From Swiss-Prot:
This is 1-deoxy-D-xylulose-5-phosphate synthase. GO terms for biological process: 1-deoxy-D-xylulose 5-phosphate biosynthetic process; isopentenyl diphosphate biosynthetic process, methylerythritol 4-phosphate pathway; terpenoid biosynthetic process; thiamine biosynthetic process. Homodimer. It is an enzyme of class 2 (transferase). It comes from Methylibium petroleiphilum (strain ATCC BAA-1232 / LMG 22953 / PM1). Its cofactor is Mg(2+); thiamine diphosphate. Pathway: Metabolic intermediate biosynthesis; 1-deoxy-D-xylulose 5-phosphate biosynthesis; 1-deoxy-D-xylulose 5-phosphate from D-glyceraldehyde 3-phosphate and pyruvate: step 1/1. One of its GO terms (molecular function) is 1-deoxy-D-xylulose-5-phosphate synthase activity. Catalyzes the acyloin condensation reaction between C atoms 2 and 3 of pyruvate and glyceraldehyde 3-phosphate to yield 1-deoxy-D-xylulose-5-phosphate (DXP). One of its GO terms (cellular component) is cytosol. It catalyses: D-glyceraldehyde 3-phosphate + pyruvate + H(+) = 1-deoxy-D-xylulose 5-phosphate + CO2. Gene3D superfamilies: 3.40.50.920, 3.40.50.970. Mg(2+) binds at D148, N177.
Length: 631
C-alpha cells in the first residue's frame, strides 16, 4: 500500500489552500502517482488526467470552490479533481458498477457543478452560472476548463461569442495539450502572462483608453500596437475579438506560473481567457511517448506498461475498419469521415492506405453529417463512422441535410447499446428510436461480426441513407467472410424453430441479443427469428410468426420507447393482427456505468433474464411447450 503523506491529509480543497508552494509541488507528485496507480488497477482515462494535475491543484488553491464554480469540459480529465474533492478513497471503484463515475456528476459531489462527458459544453454552462450569479446578486466566479480538441466544436465558439459581450465575471481556461513551449519562450511567456493579468497592466490599459477615447485614430493606433506587441509572443488575438482579455500561453505544469496568474485573473471583472499548455501523460514516460495508447487503457502494470493483447475475437470496430478498407479498394467513390474518433472508430488503417479519401473533421458532428451530404451530392459515397451517442449532436443535419434530400450516406454507428464503464452519457440507447422515425433512412442491426460486414455492404449498395448499428467490443467469434456480400435487403431469417409441437412463443431478436435469445429459446423450446432489419422491418416474417404462434417476444439493446418492439407492434396493428407481445429492451431510465455483461444481466437482457421474463409473462415452462391451441 503506497503512502501519500500530503495527499492523505486532503479531504477537501480548503485543506490545500494553506499549503506552501513547495508543499503544493509535493502534492502534485503524490496526486499524479495516485492517479496512475488507480487507473492501472481499474482501467480508465489516463493521459488526459496526468496532464491536468498541476492545473487542478492551482484552480482549487486559487478559487473558493465549491462557491466558485469549476466547469470541466468533457470531464474525462477530472480524476485529480475527484481525488481532491473527497473521493480519494473511492478511486478503487472508479467506473465500476456501484462505484464513482469517470465523469463529473452533480449527484456525486457538490464540487461537480455540471455533469458532462460530451465535449464543448463548458463555456455555455459556465456563462449560465456566471449570469445567474449576477441576477441573484451573488459574488462568485465561474471557470470553464476546455481542451484544444473541444475548441474545434461550433458550440464552443457560439458560447464565446455570447460570453464576450455579456460582461459576465467568468474565466475560460484553454488546456492546450497539443503543442509545447521551449524553455526560453516559456520563461518569457510566464513574465508576459503575469504582466498582462496584473492590476497595473489592466488599470493602465483602461486609463489609456479613457484618455484616447476622444481621439479615435490614436486609440486605434494604440490598440494595433498592443496587438502587435502581444503577437510577437502569444498566439492569435482571436479570443480578444470575442470580447475576452487573453492571457498566455503559460506552462500548465508550472505552479509558480499558474497560481499568480490565476490569482490576478480571479480579481478581474468581465470575461477572461487563460491559455495554458500541458502535455498528455505528463510525469509517466510511457504515456508521454504514446498518449493515444494510454488515453483509455484497461488494467496494466505501471512498471511494465501496456502489453500487446493476445489475438482474440475481432471487435465490431475492427470488422468495420477492415470492411472500410476492402470496400474502398473496390470502389473509388468511397470516402471515410470521422469526427475526431480515428482510433476509436477503427479508421487508422484506412487513413494510412487512403489518405486522400480520409477526413477527420474534428469534434464537429453537425459539420460531419452535412459535409457527408455535400460529398454525396457530387456522386461520392460517404461513410460516416460515428458513435451512436454522438450522432445525437448532428440530428438536425441527419434529417434536414441527408434524409430530406435522400442522399446515399452510410452511418456506421459504433457503441450502440450498453457501453459499460463510460455510463449513461455514452450509451447508444436511443439510435433505434431516433433513426427509424425519419423518412428515407434505413437501419440495420447485425447479430454478429460476419453479419456486420454484410450489413455494411448492403448499406453501401443503397441509393438512400442507411445506418448500421453495432456494439462496442468483440462479437461471438463467428468467422468473417472475405467476400463483400450483402445481406438480402429487408429480410430477416429463422434461426430456430420450436420442436415437439411447441409453437406457442416466437422470439424476434434484433442485433447481438440474438445469441442470448437463442440460449433462452433452448430452455423454452421457442422459435427464434434474427430480424436484422429494423427499418425496413421484415413484416412478412413478423406476420408469419404471428399467425403460427400464440405470442411474440421482441428483444433489443435499445430503448423500448419507439424502438424495434414498437415497430413490430405497429406492423401488427396495421395488419389487424391481435396477439400478446412482450417487448424487452432498455428501460426508461439512464443506465449507469459498469461491466456490460453485468449490466445486461441486471436489466434482464442476458439468456437467464430473457427466459425469466417470458416465464413471468406467459406462464410456467410446461405450459409454454404445449402445442398451440390454434396451431
Amino acid at each position: 500500500m503506497k503512502s501519500y503523506p500530503l495527499l492523505s491529509t486532503i479531504d477537501q480543497p480548503a485543506d490545500l489552500r494553506g499549503l506552501s508552494r513547495a508543499e503544493l509541488k509535493q502534492l502534485a507528485q503524490e496526486l499524479r502517482d495516485h492517479v496512475l496507480t488507480s487507473v492501472s488497477q481499474t482501467g480508465g482515462h489516463l493521459s488526459s488526467n496526468l496532464g491536468t494535475v498541476e492545473l487542478t491543484i492551482a484552480l482549487h488553491h486559487v478559487f473558493n470552490t465549491p462557491q466558485d464554480r469549476l466547469v470541466w469540459d468533457v470531464g474525462h480529465q477530472t480524476y485529480p479533481h475527484k481525488i481532491l474533492t473527497g473521493r480519494r478513497d473511492r478511486m478503487a471503484g472508479l467506473r465500476q458498477l456501484g462505484g464513482i463515475s469517470g465523469f463529473p456528476r452533480r449527484d456525486e459531489s457538490e464540487y461537480d457543478t455540471f455533469g458532462t462527458a460530451h465535449s464543448s459544453t463548458s463555456i455555455s454552462a459556465a456563462l449560465g452560472m456566471a449570469l445567474a450569479a449576477k441576477i441573484k446578486g451573488e459574488d462568485r466566479r465561474s471557470v470553464a476548463i476546455i481542451g484544444d480538441g473541444a475548441m474545434t466544436a461550433g458550440m464552443a465558439f457560439e458560447a464565446l461569442n455570447n460570453a464576450g459581450v455579456s460582461g459576465a465575471n467568468m474565466l475560460v481556461v484553454l488546456n492546450d495539450n497539443d503543442m509545447s513551449i521551449s524553455p526560453p519562450v516559456g520563461a518569457l511567456n510566464r513574465y508576459f502572462a503575469r504582466l498582462m493579468s496584473g492590476r497595473f497592466y489592466s488599470a493602465a490599459r483602461q486609463g489609456a483608453k479613457s484618455v484616447l477615447k476622444n481621439a479615435p485614430p490614436l486609440l486605434e493606433l494604440a490598440r494595433r500596437f498592443e496587438e502587435h506587441a502581444k503577437g510577437m509572443i502569444v498566439p492569435s488575438t482571436i479570443f480578444e475579438e470575442f470580447g475576452f482579455t487573453y492571457v498566455g500561453p503559460i506552462d500548465g505544469h508550472d505552479l509558480d506560473s499558474l497560481i499568480p496568474t490565476l490569482e490576478n485573473l480571479r480579481d478581474r471583472k468581465g470575461p477572461q481567457f487563460l491559455h495554458v499548455v500541458t502535455k498528455k501523460g505528463y510525469g509517466y514516460k510511457l504515456a508521454e511517448a504514446d498518449p493515444v495508447a494510454y488515453h483509455g487503457p484497461g488494467k496494466f502494470n505501471p512498471a511494465e506498461g501496456l502489453k500487446k493483447a493476445a489475438p482474440g475475437k475481432p471487435s465490431f470496430t475492427q470488422v468495420f475498419g477492415q470492411w472500410l478498407c476492402d470496400m474502398a479498394a473496390k470502389d473509388t467513390r468511397l470516402v471515410g469521415i470521422t469526427p475526431a474518433m480515428r482510433e476509436g472508430s477503427g479508421m487508422v488503417e484506412f487513413e494510412q492506405r487512403f489518405p486522400d479519401r480520409y477526413f477527420d473533421v474534428g469534434i464537429a458532428e453537425q459539420h460531419a453529417v452535412t459535409f457527408a451530404a455535400g460529398l454525396a451530392c457530387e456522386g461520392l459515397k460517404p461513410v460516416v463512422a460515428i458513435y451512436s451517442t454522438f450522432l445525437q449532436r448532428g440530428y438536425d443535419q441527419l434529417i434536414h441535410d441527408v434524409a430530406i434530400q435522400n442522399l446515399p450516406v452510410v452511418f456506421a454507428l459504433d457503441r450502440a447499446g450498453i457501453v459499460g464503464a463510460d455510463g449513461a452519457t455514452h450509451a447508444g440507447a436511443y439510435d433505434i428510436a431516433y433513426v427509424r422515425c425519419v423518412p428515407h433512412l434505413s437501419l440495420i442491426a447485425p447479430a454478429d461480426e460476419n453479419e456486420c460486414r454484410q450489413a455494411l455492404t448492403a448499406a453501401f449498395e443503397q441509393q438512400h441513407p442507411v445506418a448500421v448499428r453495432y456494439p462496442r467490443g468483440a462479437g461471438v467469434g463467428v468467422a468473417v467472410q472475405s467476400e463483400l456480400t450483402a445481406l438480402p435487403w429487408g429480410r430477416g431469417e429463422l434461426r430456430r424453430e420450436a420442436r415437439g409441437g411447441g409453437r406457442r412463443i416466437a422470439i424476434l431478436a434484433f442485433g447481438t441479443l440474438l445469441y442470448p435469445a437463442l440460449a433462452a429459446a433452448e430452455k423454452l423450446d421457442a422459435t427464434v427469428a434474427n430480424m436484422r432489419f429494423i427499418k425496413p422491418l421484415d413484416t412478412e416474417l413478423v406476420l408469419s410468426l404471428a399467425r403460427s404462434h400464440e405470442a411474440l417476444v421482441t428483444v433489443e439493446e435499445g430503448c423500448l420507447q419507439g424502438g424495434a418492439g414498437s415497430a413490430v407492434l405497429e406492423a401488427l396493428q396495421a395488419a389487424g393482427v391481435n396477439l400478446p407481445v412482450l417487448t424487452l429492451g432498455l428501460p426508461d431510465e439512464f443506465v449507469e456505468h459498469g461491466d456490460p455483461a453485468k449490466l445486461l444481466a441486471q436489466l434482464g437482457l442476458d439468456a437467464a433474464g430473457i427466459e425469466q421474463s417470458i416465464l413471468k409473462r406467459f406462464g410456467a415452462k410446461l405450459e409454454l411447450v404445449r402445442p398451440a391451441i390454434n396451431g
